[in-house]
């Protein structure tokens, strides 16, 4: 117990009484967007277009308890690397002065990898608790320990995370215009 207790900081605001720890920090936040669109007028009746959008983001924070992690001001304790791609192609074709055909096809993909601040660190020996963690780096890290109403240690249970989400969409329309437009 004393090895775990050594990871908890002393109170930083004695005026508020025992157990009050406050800290400020700025989370990591770096987002880059790249967008482009191309229009091609195949003829006076047919317009074809395509667009590309890519966002890369590195977002994260550092836990206030150091190696014991805990909460991270403005973020979760760790680092997330995300890429979102959004691509689409479409067209509009004037078949007659009163009949228009249009359509669009879209694709969206999100790749995300999030690792906690303590990812891969083995605390079994440091804390003297055999059996915590395992051979896989995803099983390691500081254990989640809560003491009363205080903020606990470790990273949120959903970390680490690796995911790829993709979606496709398409829509096609034929419009008939009646009368003056």
Model segments located where?
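Short acidic-glycine motifs
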Residues: 1-181
């Amino acid at each position: 117990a004393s090895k775990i207790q050594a990871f908890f900081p002393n109170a930083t605001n004695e005026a508020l009484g025992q157990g009050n720890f406050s800290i400020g920090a700025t989370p990591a936040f770096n987002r880059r967007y790249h967008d482009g669109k191309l229009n091609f007028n195949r003829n006076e009746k047919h317009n074809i277009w395509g667009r590309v959008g890519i966002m890369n983001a590195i977002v994260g924070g550092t836990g206030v308890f150091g190696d014991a992690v805990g909460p991270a001001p403005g973020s979760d304790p760790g680092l997330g690397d995300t890429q979102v791609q959004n691509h689409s192609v479409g067209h509009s074709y004037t078949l007659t002065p009163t009949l228009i055909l249009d359509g669009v096809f879209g694709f969206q993909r999100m790749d995300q990898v999030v690792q906690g601040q303590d990812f891969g660190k083995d605390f079994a020996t440091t804390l003297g608790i055999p059996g915590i963690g395992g051979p896989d780096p995803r099983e390691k890290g500081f254990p989640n320990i809560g003491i009363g109403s205080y903020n606990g240690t470790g990273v949120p249970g959903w970390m680490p995370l690796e995911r790829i989400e993709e979606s496709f969409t398409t829509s096609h329309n034929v419009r008939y215009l009646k009368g003056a437009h």
